A protein has these predicted regions:
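Predominant activation on well-ordered alpha-helical scaffold segments within soluble catalytic domains
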Residues: 6, 10, 30, 124-132
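N-terminal capping segment at the start of a domain
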Residues: 1-20
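Active-site metal-coordination/substrate-binding segment of hydrolases
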Residues: 60-138
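A non-catalytic alpha/beta surface segment that caps or lines the substrate-entry region
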Residues: 17-60
Length: 138
């Protein structure tokens, strides 16, 4: 993973958010989408963010990406995402030749571990990556 993508992933994972308290992630998305050329977006009353890029001819369809902006872990004011040791072998003892795996973990500023909501926030990350990669996305 190149540094630009890794930095974006760490940035998305570091946004503190929780169910019904998604304002931080919504604002993060607005800031990122404002900087993306040719992307139009709006936010509805429920804080859902809808973004599109490009135009289609009649009968064509956008690829569409959907992700959650909330997580279920305890909300903390700041999440520090750190790269930890590369994981090899996996937790079941399997090895994959010479492959190594990056581990990202979240901590509070005082060093306590915290959830990063990676299952939801990785969807946000992927949606942003698709907006960068494709001409027509919704």
């Amino acid at each position: 993973m190149d540094n630009t993508r890794l930095n974006r992933l760490k940035e998305v994972l570091s946004v503190p958010t929780k169910t019904y308290q998604e304002e931080n992630m919504v604002q993060y998305l607005r800031d990122v989408l404002d900087a993306m050329p040719d992307v139009e977006y709006y936010t509805d009353d429920l804080k859902n963010v809808y973004a599109t890029k490009g135009t289609l001819n009649e009968g064509e369809y956008y690829p569409m990406f959907i992700a959650h902006t909330d997580t279920v872990h305890q909300l903390v004011d700041k999440i520090v995402v750190q790269e930890e040791s590369l994981v090899k072998p996996d937790t079941f003892g399997h090895t994959y030749g010479d492959e190594e795996f990056l581990s990202l973990k979240g901590y509070t500023p005082n060093g306590s571990s915290t959830g990063i909501g990676g299952d939801d926030k990785c969807g946000v990350y992927l949606a942003l990556e698709m907006l960068d990669a494709y001409d027509n996305v919704k």
